[in-house]
Amino acid sequence: MTGFFTILSFSLAALSVTNAAQILSVPKGAEVVPNGYIVVMKDDTSQQDFSSHRVWISSIHHNMTRRGLDGAGVKQTYDFDHLRGYSGIFDEDTIKDISNDPKVAFVEPDAIISQHVVVQQRKAPWGLSRLSNRRGGRNYVFDSSAGSGVWAYVVDSGVDVRHAEFQGRAVWGSNLVDNKNSDGTGHGTHVAGTIAGKTYGIAKKAKVVAVKVLNSEGKGPTSGIIAGINWSIRHARKHGMLQKSVLNMSLGGTYSAGLNHATAQAIKAGMFVSVSAGNDNINSNGNSPASERSVCTIAASTENDGKASFSNWGPAVDLYAPGHNILSARPGGGSQTMSGTSMAAPHAAGVAAYLIAKEGIPGNRACLRLKQLSQPTIRNPGPDTTTRLLYNGSGR
């Protein structure tokens, strides 16, 4: 994980005038989009008021351009069931005007998010057998339903949807970060392979939907992550799949109220959401989306049921899952081994998809079910952190 995500402390300092919406700050040293901001409206803002606000924003776009702020204006609009907002490029004067609108809840800088992978090396896989046996074992034990009828939204760096691991079950969904419909880092393909690959996957019959929010450097703006969540909810709703969907985000950055709020909307809509805890060996309460308490936040375990040395910890962690030396798919064919909480989170997404198909539970109740089935086997988990290890309930 790159340096600008290692900072734990954060401030919610109000920079705006009295009675105006807060303009939240980011930790010192955090990487941000220049002049980029995320604006979140108050919960009771009607669709009509939101439309009027956007018309007003459009009217000042010309003024921003005249002041020399190239590319200014609204870039993305968010319209969740219980969250309305937008992101874009705005100068300081415009942000002050926006924050003074009584319909605005808060404004925050658009920080950069990155994937949670730390190392790549060759070694045999072990995660599948571990999550299907209470005391460990060499075989992966699972029900033949294997995630059939469940969709897995991989909000990541893209997925090689033509990889043989997916047997035609992977499709391209949306690209919200660049114009390259490919996986430039291999991260998203590896994650998807753990969720639903025929060899390396847990839910071997689930459908994969690629939602690209990270570029070829494994980075993307918070605004794009929010847009990816919004797109996934809309897509699942359109196809009647909200309660039969899992959404995995093996990524994170500094605390973002907007990202946490958006992530919670997916659970409220009916989906299961797994996120990686982070790779800085610190309390994950300072990171987003890991600090959002309604999601399933996953820390990384080792082959010997210990906490991986890099894994974040803390009360926000719901479960541990295999995250060290995990073998999965690689873009262009073949496989590769990666380590990180990025590798742990898709194990949880895969088991959630498996249980949704096997037991018929709705997606937004799957995290509770995972915790019910989990085993208290993790040694030295970290301060105020669960000892529960992911288990699919099918082994011995």
UniProtKB/Swiss-Prot annotation:
Residues 377-389 have a biased composition (Polar residues). One of its GO terms (cellular component) is extracellular region. One of its GO terms (molecular function) is serine-type endopeptidase activity. Residues 125-396 form the Peptidase S8 domain. Glycans are attached at N63, N230, N248, N392. It is found in: Secreted. Residues 21-116 form a propeptide. Residues 1-20 form the signal peptide. It is an enzyme of class 3 (hydrolase). GO terms for biological process: proteolysis. It comes from the Eukaryota. Residues 37-113 form the Inhibitor I9 domain. The keyword Iron does not apply. Residues 377-396 are annotated as: Disordered. Its EC number is 3.4.21.-. InterPro entries: PCSK9_ProteinaseK-like (IPR034193), Peptidase_S8/S53_dom (IPR000209), Peptidase_S8/S53_dom_sf (IPR036852), Peptidase_S8_Asp-AS (IPR023827), Peptidase_S8_His-AS (IPR022398), Peptidase_S8_Ser-AS (IPR023828), Peptidase_S8_subtilisin-like (IPR050131), Peptidase_S8_subtilisin-rel (IPR015500). The active site is at D156 (charge relay system), H187 (charge relay system), S342 (charge relay system). Keywords: Glycoprotein, Hydrolase, Protease, Secreted, Serine protease, Signal, Virulence, Zymogen. Belongs to the peptidase S8 family. Secreted subtilisin-like serine protease with keratinolytic activity that contributes to pathogenicity. This is Subtilisin-like protease 5. The gene is SUB5.
